[in-house]
Curated annotation (Swiss-Prot):
The record marks 106-107 as: Cleavage. Cleaved between Leu-106 and Arg-107 by the IrrE metalloprotease after exposure to radiation. Cleavage inactivates DdrOC, leading to derepression of the target genes. GO terms for molecular function: DNA binding; DNA-binding transcription factor activity. Signal peptide: none annotated. This is HTH-type transcriptional regulator DdrOC. Pfam families: HTH_3 (PF01381). Repressor specific for genes preceded by a radiation/desiccation response motif (RDRM) site, which is present upstream of several radiation-induced genes. Keywords: DNA-binding, Repressor, Stress response, Transcription, Transcription regulation. Residues 18-37 bind DNA. It comes from the Bacteria.
Length: 129
């Protein structure tokens, strides 16, 4: 499934109009329409906003979406997607941090859970800020 199809599917499943979603996501109706028609691609920030409008995680929004013929199935590690979805901790994690954290791996191992991801985020933020 392509991203624009997934976006339209999410809206249709919920019985929402373009106007409803655009208002909650604070984007224009024409822009949302272009996204759903595949005429333009959203930024990570827009994906986070749309995921919030649908009350799902970005991971869930992208689940099964294909990019360049490859599926995003399991694109973000579960613990990281749990951290992003956390209503208290998630808003602290900017799109840049999501990209940075999603690349962390050493000898095939990644942090195990939400708490591990959060500790790594805090340490890196302290060191790099």
């Amino acid at each position: 499934m392509k991203l624009h199809e997934r976006l339209r599917e999410l809206r249709s499943e919920r019985g929402l109009r373009l106007k409803d979603v655009a208002e909650v996501a604070q984007i224009s109706v024409p822009y949302l329409s272009d996204l759903e028609r595949g005429r333009t691609n959203p930024s990570l920030e827009t994906l986070q906003t749309l995921a919030g409008a649908y009350n799902i995680t970005v991971h869930d929004l992208l689940e099964g979406v294909e990019f360049y013929g490859a599926s995003t199935e399991g694109a973000l590690p579960k613990g990281l997607s749990d951290l992003i979805a956390d209503p208290t901790l998630g808003p602290q994690i900017t799109p840049d941090w999501v990209r940075t954290l999603s690349r962390i791996e050493l000898r095939g191992k990644r942090p195990r859970d939400k708490q591990d991801w959060y500790e790594i985020y805090l340490h890196l933020k302290r060191i790099l800020s």
